[in-house]
Every structure is written in C-alpha cells, then in structure tokens.
Amino acid sequence: MAIQTDGIVLRNKTIKSIKSIYFLLEIDCPSIANETKPGQFVMLRTSDDNHPLLRRPFSVCKSYSTLHPRKGKRGHLLILYKKVGKGTQKMSTFKEGQEVNLIGPLGNGFILPPLPSSTPTILIGGGMGMASLSALGETLGSGELYVFIGGKTKDDILCGDDFPKGKVFIATEDGSRGKKGTVVGLFLSEIERFDRGRPHHVYICGPEGMVKSLSKVLKSKKWIVQVSLEARMGCGFGACWGCVVKTKNTEMVYQRVCKDGPVFPLSEIVWE
C-alpha cells in the first residue's frame, strides 16, 4: 500500500563523470523501501516552493529493506535520474541530510519467474529504462540471465555493472561502446542463441520506439514477455487518467500506466 512520507537524502551524486547529467539519489526511507517490489515507482516532490507544482515519477533502482539489508544498506531507496528539466534540475541540488517528500511504492511491478527456474531470463533496456531492470536483476535466482543494454553513446550506458551473474551485451548508436547500432539490432543478432524451442522470461523497459520494435520481433515467440512502460504522469495513482495506454485482452480498453501498470504483458499493448 502506498504512503506519503518524508525521507532523508543520504547522497546525491553524478555518475559517469563530474559533468554527467545522470545522478544517483539515495534516500533513507524504510517505510517505502520495506514494501517496494521491482518495477514499482515513487512520486517525488522536487521542491518546497511548488515550482514545479506536480511531483515527478521515478522508478526505484534499488530498495534495501530493514528485514533484508544488503551491502550495509538498510531501509534505503536508490533513484537513478537524468537532469533534463526544472524538476530534475532542482533534484540535482539536494544535499545530504535534506528532507524529501515521497509517495510510494506505486504501480504494479514485475511478476518474477518461479524459483528455482531453469527458464532463461532476458532483460532488454534502453537509457533510463535500465533503472527498473537493475532492481529486477537483484531479485532473480541463479538461472541463465542475459542482459541487453542500449544507449546513444557510452555515457548513456547505465547499470552495466549491476548484473554480475548475467551475460551483458551492449550497443551504442555511435559505436563508442559495445556494438554499433541499437539495442534492438543487437538483440536480433543474438536471438538465435535463445530460439531453441525453450520458453523464456523477457523483461523490457525503455523508449517507446524500442519497445514497439521489440513487440514486432517477439510477437511470434511463445515467451513470457513483460514491459514496463514510460509515461508522463500527473498524479501517480490513477485519479487524473493522464497516462492511459490502449490495451487488449478480450476487448479493447484504456488502462492507466501509473495504476494498472507500469508493467504489462507486452502482448496486451496496442500500438497506434
């Protein structure tokens, strides 16, 4: 159940380089960290002066509960964000010890493969989509894991070191790291190694164009594919209906990314 509460900033640092636009925000917030599942998100107030007025949604990159602490962290949330507008500009000035207000955990997260599982797992992410996949990676068992990461340049490759148990494939559009091209093209070049009649669990998060392309590639596969959708959100809990997506099951319906998602079966998304 989502709650509104204050957390304390533990660190707020750039990653990649000192001039990077990517930041990692660590917050001491046990009441939310204890309940967060991979794929869920929080709505964070980025300023005290209501400029901007609306909260901003952020996937939880890591959550360390008080019952299951890891790496010396207990009750902490990690949020990966990119400085792109007024809200994230103000976030980049958060100082250690500062109070921040959050609502969470929100949305429906990923459905995990049953454990133990011999079914291979594939993660495919682009850009900031790697945040929710990083959270997922820490919860998977010891089965086969393949991770495909894409970005425009080497500076846009995020969370590449977060999957020590998996085989990581990287693509950049300018060829500055890994294979030159898109992550979809990279996945297509490797798909034969997976296409052996076995079922697979596939998890996707990234830009809409990437997800659309993967939908075409995977629609003929009898794989279990889940996608975490990115969307602009007004409220974060379904009241404003500002983040709807058309889906199909037995009939066409509009569902709210914030409330009914952000994770959906890929086969249910209707692309227009």
Q: Which role fits each region the language model picked out?
A:
Residues 2-96:
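Ferredoxin-reductase
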Residues 36-39, 57, 77, 133, ...:
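A general structural signal for well-ordered alpha-helical segments in protein cores
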Residues 66-68, 73, 86-232:
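FNR/FR-type flavoprotein reductase catalytic core
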Residues 132, 208-209, 230-262:
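Local cysteine-cluster metal-coordination motifs and their immediate loop/turn environment
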Residues 251, 264-272:
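A charged, well-structured terminal subsegment
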